């Protein structure tokens, strides 16, 4: 299944999702993947009650789809080429807990190009080579994020929703796996 189809599957699969960015590496080679949330739960007991969450590991450029403590799928991602941070207009990937504010594009064709969260009628040509283009299309679907931590990713000058922070498709699939967004 292609990355875009997997991405589409994620969007349609959840009724409650959280996006967590952090710099902790998760070892997916552990024998018991059911215990992957142990470290997260010890710092955030409320995670134990979550049916599903997406966990983003900035260091390894991966996102895990976790359901009831079990890793269902690992996805390679691309965070911001400018690093991590929450300051408005910094173009950086914010850290911390987020929830999905809005899903956009559920009825659009795969690789539809969205500008300003609206399909412009065009379909992106997917670039499999590690080529950074000038256009950086947002494609297929958008999961618009809302920060949940006042002073970290929510509030004046640092608000993830106001900054239009998304999980989204890209035409530059050859760059996935390293900071390139």
Language-model regions, residue ranges each:
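Bacterial N-terminal signal peptides that target proteins for export
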Residues: 2-11
């Amino acid at each position: 299944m292609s990355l875009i189809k997997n991405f589409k599957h994620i969007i349609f699969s959840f009724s409650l999702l959280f996006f967590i960015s952090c710099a902790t590496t998760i070892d997916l080679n552990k024998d018991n993947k059911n215990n992957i949330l142990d470290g997260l739960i010890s710092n955030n007991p409320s995670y134990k009650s979550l049916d599903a969450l997406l966990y983003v590991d900035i260091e390894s450029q991966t996102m895990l789809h976790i359901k009831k403590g079990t890793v269902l799928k690992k996805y390679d991602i691309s965070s911001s080429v400018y690093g991590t941070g929450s300051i408005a207009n910094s173009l950086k990937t914010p850290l911390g807990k987020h929830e999905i504010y809005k899903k956009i594009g559920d009825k659009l064709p795969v690789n539809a190009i969205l500008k300003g969260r609206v399909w412009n009628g065009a379909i992106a040509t997917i670039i499999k080579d590690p080529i950074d283009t000038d256009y950086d299309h947002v494609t297929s679907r958008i999961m618009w994020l809302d920060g949940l931590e006042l002073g970290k990713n929510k509030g004046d000058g640092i608000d993830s929703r106001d900054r239009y922070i998304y999980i989204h498709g890209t035409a530059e699939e050859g760059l996935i796996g390293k900071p390139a967004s």
